[in-house]
Amino acid sequence: MDTDILRMQDKEVFEAIAGETLRQTETLELIASENFTSRAVMQACGSLMTNKYAEGYPGKRYYGGCEFVDIAENLARDRAKKLFGCQYVNVQPHSGSSANMAVLFSVLKPGDRIMGLDLSHGGHLTHGSPVNFSGQLFDAHSYGVDRETGCIDMNRVEELALEVRPKLIICGASAYSQGFDFKAFREIADKVGALLMADIAHPAGLIAAGLLSDPMPHCHFVTTTTHKTLRGPRGGMIMMGSDFENPLGITIKTKTGSRVKMMSEVMDAEVMPGIQGGPLMHIIAGKAVAFGEALQPAFREYAVQVRKNAAAMAESFAGLGYNIVSGGTKNHLMLLDLRNKEVNGKVAENLLHEAGITVNKNMVPFDDKSPFVTSGIRIGTAAMTTRGMTENDSRTVAGLIDQVISSANSAGVEEICRTVRHDIRELCLAYPLEGYGVNP
């Protein structure tokens, strides 16, 4: 990657980027929410489209000179529709949280009841956490996983829905290794007159590849990030399988009177000007490139390998005596409960960092430790698969992680971390990230 101008103009920023480049290329990225974009995506994101203001939507902008950014946004929208089989898409949200906020604000009033997966059971901040807008502006109620199986108890979901009668049910997670039964969630939502939103930020790439159940036929709204398993730039997106009249009865004047606005109209207005102003057109261009890549046959091969790698790694961990929440994985991630290993998530994360392996500490269901300590770690295979690693490498990595965690309380842990770091560097150099270097 050409960074000569940056190196000459701003050495401090250049050195920060150079250090991050070295970290990404020579250490192993296993954070489940991270991935590596293609050079084409990075070129689009680094293009001069970053200079253009484009408030509004293609063909209806508040600024002139938008003919070319209109092309980029229309490409992103059309490709996303084809990729996910949806009728409506908005590619302007800056993040997954922004996308979720737009949906909630478009169909709810402050104080309305919502239901989502408990954050400590694998949910997300925007699904009703009390420290987030979703839990502060709305009356949030959480469902969780079964203590024995680690899987979502749909009977309990139904019981809670019948009890609290939410206006919106959210199905989605940030640390749940099983799939979601969107059909069952829709049946529950219909029983209580609730709308249903699927947050597929984590498994979006696997869903696009047809490897996990499709939320479009069952959910009123589907939100996602565009990075993670989609391998695009950091951003968000809102989709609907089909359009419908908005449930709040918001109307618009017509030549002959008025009509009820379609949900797509309400949603577009909620994104802009509701919660955002100008879209990030360079990022939207990057989204278009990423969606184009995801439409190619090679992307499905990638997604298949992501699942194979996760399954192989989970099987290896189970064989080494680790407790995997929910008993295994059907997607790209797994959550390890380390309580039987006598080490907490914070210690494990720090030691693995010293060993050249990046994971994140994570609460496990019914955790008795704080979110800053936790009893578990979350591991994902999306990024390592982008490098070209396969099942054997996944098993090797599980063994190296075990070496570090098993020695956490021993006097020789520092030496083991140094040895593992060397092995990890050799593994990463065997699967280089093409085009990610910086000019010295």
Swiss-Prot record:
Location of N6-(pyridoxal phosphate)lysine modifications: 228
Record Pfam families: SHMT
Alphabetized UniProt keyword annotations: Amino-acid biosynthesis, Cytoplasm, One-carbon metabolism, Pyridoxal phosphate, Transferase
Required cofactor(s): pyridoxal 5'-phosphate
Keyword Methyltransferase assigned: no
Record localization: Cytoplasm
Domain of life, source organism: Bacteria
Sites annotated Plays an important role in substrate specificity: 227
The keyword Cytoplasm belongs to this UniProt entry's keyword annotation: yes
Any one GO CC term of the record: cytosol
Protein name: Serine hydroxymethyltransferase
Protein species of origin: Chlorobium limicola (strain DSM 245 / NBRC 103803 / 6330)
Annotated gene: glyA
